[in-house]
């Protein structure tokens, strides 16, 4: 038994010597205990970075949804293009999806309360219909959804629709004007528009000065042409004033518009520049007195006057007269002179005190006062 045990130990010993005597391959080294045995590779792998959608940026700007459709023959519908060209006499039906729809269309149709246009609100859409169209109806038609809380509504900017329609009429290249001569005021602090709009989309339109006779180029810097508005003076100044007209050419025909008198405004926009002056600040009993309130402003800006005077509570009879006229202040500068005068006859003690005038326009109001004493 011992012999077999010794023989087995001898064989194991020889086997271990054979293993330890083997040579390692070139460029190989023995693995350390616990070393990663995964075969290394030279392949480069580009890490993938997951794309994260920026929800805040996407949600901050709501998408605008066009809600307008044009009704065609036989009940067909289509989304109207930004501009449409139709023949005068054709009917137009536009629909906008929504239970509360607001509409805007050329002011010409509203000014004369034209029965050719009708606006209706149905359960699911608003409807605008225009029949027997004319070239004067050329303009923008737009709609929008309304967000209402009770009787108070506001425009939903995300649900709108619009189209500009040219109504082409034989012999009419320009949208008709109610007069043969219009005035355009040139304000130094805002754009001015010569409103010669055409009824044919493809018409070539140029601007001309009457004297000295020459074409005024729309160079895109001082003057640009907008088919929806006309010729736009971006930065008006006094050199632009004078008489101008437009010329349109289309289909081998040409036409001249009405004439426009361009007047430069010397007074910039703002609340009324107001002064007050009494005919006398000391008045004897039984005499008459007048107090004058004067405003110099833009030619096309109306001014409203209101008065507060000492005898008002006692219903003292007075006379108030408002007038205005255009005046030229040299170098072609034109301003509007607006005046209001309050007259008190047979002056009494209750008429003594402060006479207060308030002048108001679209930009604001100005209040001035003066005193009239009893002497």
From Swiss-Prot:
The main location is secreted
Gene Ontology terms, cellular component aspect?
A: extracellular region
Which residues does UniProt assign to the signal peptide? Answer: 1-21
Q: Could you tell me which residues belong to the region Disordered?
A: 22-64
Q: Which PROSITE patterns match?
A: IG_LIKE
Q: Where is the composition biased (Basic residues)?
A: 40-50
Annotated ranges, domain Ig-like C2-type: 62-159, 272-375
Report if keyword Glycoprotein is assigned.
yes
Against Pfam families, the record matches this protein to: Ig_3 (PF13927), VEGFR-1-like_Ig-like (PF21339)
Disulphide bridges:
96-143, 293-357
Per UniProt, subcellular location reads as:
Secreted
Recite the UniProt keywords alphabetically. Disulfide bond, Glycoprotein, Immunoglobulin domain, Repeat, Secreted, Signal
Q: Does the keyword Lipid biosynthesis apply?
A: no
Annotated glycan sites? 132, 219
What InterPro entries does the entry give? Ig-like_dom, Ig-like_dom_sf, Ig-like_fold, Ig_sub, Ig_sub2, PDGFRL
Q: How does it assemble?
A: Forms a complex composed of PDGFRL, TNK2 and GRB2.
Name of the protein in question:
Platelet-derived growth factor receptor-like protein
Gene source species: Macaca fascicularis
């Amino acid at each position: 038994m011992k012999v077999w045990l010794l023989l087995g130990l001898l064989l194991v010993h020889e086997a271990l010597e054979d293993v330890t005597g083997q040579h390692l391959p070139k460029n190989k080294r023995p693995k350390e205990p616990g070393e990663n045995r995964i075969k290394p590779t030279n392949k480069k792998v580009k890490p993938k970075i997951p794309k994260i959608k920026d929800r805040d940026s996407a949600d901050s700007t709501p998408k605008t949804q066009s809600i307008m459709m044009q009704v065609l023959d036989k009940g067909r519908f289509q989304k109207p293009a930004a501009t449409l060209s139709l023949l005068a006499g054709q009917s137009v039906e536009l629909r906008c999806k929504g239970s509360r729809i607001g509409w805007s269309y050329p002011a010409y149709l509203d000014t004369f309360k034209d029965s050719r246009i009708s606006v209706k609100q149905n359960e699911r859409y608003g409807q605008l219909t225009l029949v027997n169209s004319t070239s004067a109806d050329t303009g923008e038609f737009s709609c929008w959804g309304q967000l209402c809380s009770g009787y108070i509504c506001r425009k939903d900017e995300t649900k709108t629709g619009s189209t500009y329609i040219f109504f082409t009429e034989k012999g009419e290249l320009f949208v008709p004007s109610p007069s043969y001569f219009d005035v355009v005021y040139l304000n130094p602090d805002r754009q001015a528009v010569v409103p010669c709009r055409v009824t044919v989309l493809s018409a070539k339109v140029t601007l001309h000065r009457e004297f000295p006779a020459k074409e005024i180029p729309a160079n895109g810097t001082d003057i640009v042409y907008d088919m929806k508005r006309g010729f736009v003076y971006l930065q008006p100044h006094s050199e632009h004033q004078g008489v101008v007209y437009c010329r349109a050419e289309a289909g081998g025909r040409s036409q001249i518009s009405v004439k426009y008198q361009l007047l430069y405004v010397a007074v910039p926009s703002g609340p009324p520049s107001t002064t007050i002056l009494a005919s006398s600040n000391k008045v004897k009993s039984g005499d008459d007195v007048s107090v004058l309130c004067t405003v110099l402003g833009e030619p096309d800006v109306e001014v409203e006057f209101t008065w507060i005077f000492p005898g008002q509570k006692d219903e003292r009879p007075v006379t108030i007269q408002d007038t205005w006229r255009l005046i030229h202040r040299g170098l072609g500068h034109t301003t509007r002179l607006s005046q209001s005068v309050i007259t008190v006859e047979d002056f009494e003690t209750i008429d003594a005190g402060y006479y207060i005038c308030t002048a108001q326009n679209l930009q604001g109001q100005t209040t001035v006062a003066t005193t009239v004493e009893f002497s």
